[in-house]
Amino acid sequence: RMGELVVKYAGGALALNDKPRAAAVIKFAAITEGITSLLAYAILVGLADLAARFIIKDPSVTVYILVYGLMIIGNMLAETGTAVLQITNHFRSQAILNLFQNVTTAVWIGIAFLTKSGLGSILAGYLMGKMIFGIGTVALMLAHAPAALGKGWWRTSLKGLSDWRSLAQFAFTTNLSGTINMVIRDSEVLWVGFFLTKADAGYYKFALAIMNIILMP
């Protein structure tokens, strides 16, 4: 959730035309997000086998967990990049990227379904979409940021962030809150898989998807 930090601190700095501070905040956010993403994937690697055995109850899917988990690496700067596009008013670029991601995923999965390619191809389609979004977001950030922050903005020293403790505290609290919400709200399918079967988890996931469509305003 580093996007909130970028919007609050870098966006505020840009509003005051303090480009060096905005650049330093974005650099701080990108470094922090990159490090935590690498740590997250390392934790995933360590827990993948346990998840396959006790939640999915099929050790053979460990490789699928590891491969699909590469989306963490592909999106390691996505939060920061998305926030930079927002504070620099490049919403149209975001919309086009999202559309391209969704179309690519839908076409890939559609082909996999028609050719009966199996679970691996379907996961590859989802992974491709996530990679397009993550890498595309960073590419757009690097393309548009110089106009708002100046050329060579990434070389800005972090020493200018005298309130780095405040930034770190904000990042920690927002990410902790997001993690708690995710564990409570988004882990239902995992608990179903743990206590029941993977088929039950699949049915529950499908039911949630249908319910979300029905409840859409």
What do the predicted segments below correspond to?
Residues 1-15, 30-37, 72-80, 175-187, ...:
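Small-residue-rich midsections of specific transmembrane alpha-helices
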Residues 25, 60-62, 119-124, 162-174, ...:
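Interfacial/gating helices of multi-pass transporter permease domains
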Residues 27-56, 67, 111:
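Alpha-helical transmembrane segments of multi-pass membrane transport and lipid-handling proteins
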Residues 42, 46, 57-81, 95-99:
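Alpha-helical transmembrane segments of multi-pass membrane proteins
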Residues 47, 51, 184-196:
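Hydrophobic/aromatic end-of-helix segments at the C-terminal termini of transmembrane alpha-helices
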Residues 58, 87-88, 115-116, 183, ...:
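Helix-loop interface residues and adjacent transmembrane-helix termini in multi-pass membrane transporters
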Residues 62, 66, 96-148, 152, ...:
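Hydrophobic alpha-helical transmembrane segments
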Residues 119, 123, 137-185:
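Interhelical loop/hinge segments that connect adjacent transmembrane helices in multipass membrane
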